[in-house]
């Protein structure tokens, strides 16, 4: 809503991955329920690569660890996800929870204030 670039990362359970889970698995739709787990190094890598790669911009992703080879092409990893819709509060595949007009005044004020920064 602010118009600033961002990458929102929602991790699975820290360090609950299996020994064969070497691949980063990005999903969307607010799917974090406790399982599957995620290697904390995968969380750090997704945070870093989301900031460095253009395809990571305006993304809300859940990150998990899965069986398979480690990711080497982070641009492609993020490109396989969908960008969030401009001006929408929720992630692209999230359930639309609360319309902005129904958010508390302090939340609406913060969003308006942060949207003015840098403009």
Regions found by a protein language model. Name each.
Residues 1-91:
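Oxidoreductase cofactor-interface core, primarily capturing Rossmann-like NAD(P)-dependent enzymes
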Residues 88-119:
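Amphipathic terminal alpha-helices
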């Amino acid at each position: 809503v602010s118009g600033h670039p961002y990458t929102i990362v929602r991790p699975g359970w820290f360090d609950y991955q299996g020994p064969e889970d070497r691949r980063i698995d990005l999903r969307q739709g607010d799917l974090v329920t406790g399982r599957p787990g995620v290697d904390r190094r995968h969380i750090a890598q997704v945070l870093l690569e989301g900031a460095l790669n253009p395809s990571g911009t305006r993304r809300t992703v859940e990150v998990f660890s899965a069986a398979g080879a480690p990711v080497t092409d982070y641009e492609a990893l993020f490109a396989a996800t969908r960008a969030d819709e401009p001006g929408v509060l929720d992630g692209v595949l999230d359930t639309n929870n609360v319309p902005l007009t129904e958010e508390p005044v302090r939340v609406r004020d913060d969003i308006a204030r942060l949207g003015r920064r840098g403009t």
